[in-house]
């Protein structure tokens, strides 16, 4: 497995004839994964809104007036109940997101309890909590955390157009710090923020050339939220989106590639092309933080139509 890809190589792959690109991605995908299996993750917002960061796409930022209802950290009993529901629906991983720049230690202690309780249910755990200090990463490691999510979102060149309260390098430093503690990484991006195709390739290339590639790579389609400033003038070309999925599979052959936000706006046919291109995971359950997703019965019907089966065991 390579982590010395060049931009020139990646762009040449992206620009292959689409059917050739899909064939190449699917061939690589089959070396490492069962092409008829899909991993299911479910995500719970454990603390909603009032985030001090100014990410221009995000409904949870305190900088913008949105319809979002702010909510404090959920209680442990609610968390356990939601995790049990996730397991019943076929999820193997339970993800917990909190709208913080950085957690306070007193709040992180509660999150660590949550991790321990979810692990008791036989589920993998993932959290996304913002920027962390080293002693906080150690706390998460001790609690048994499997994955830490910290998306790079876009290229270093475009980053200042989506957020100015922190930098691209801040995010990258967090990824590297978490990895030092042996916690698996979940990191991807958002397509459709107004970035160029070169920006998309640059973002993927950064992840693919890390010393250890992320084990999970969520790819989000931008969803416009009323009240937030980002409002790209053009829609995402569906074939370009499929190309990004296929390029991700080729650059990161062992990673789970997850279709994340924006699936509500994707047709069954487009999602199926993404699965052909190497996507093998979704966020499931009708809600992704503050945006809507397909209902479980919609996804189950699609899986039935195309012959996909949910992975039944924890994925490592």
UniProtKB/Swiss-Prot annotation:
Cofactor: [4Fe-4S] cluster; [2Fe-2S] cluster
EC number: 2.8.1.6
Cofactor comment text: Binds 1 [4Fe-4S] cluster. The cluster is coordinated with 3 cysteines and an exchangeable S-adenosyl-L-methionine.
Radical SAM core domain segment(s): 36-260
A GO MF label: 2 iron, 2 sulfur cluster binding
GO BP annotation list: biotin biosynthetic process
Residues that, per the record, bind [4Fe-4S] cluster: 51, 55, 58
Subunit structure: Homodimer.
Protein name: Biotin synthase
Organism expressing this protein natively: Lawsonia intracellularis (strain PHE/MN1-00)
Gene: bioB
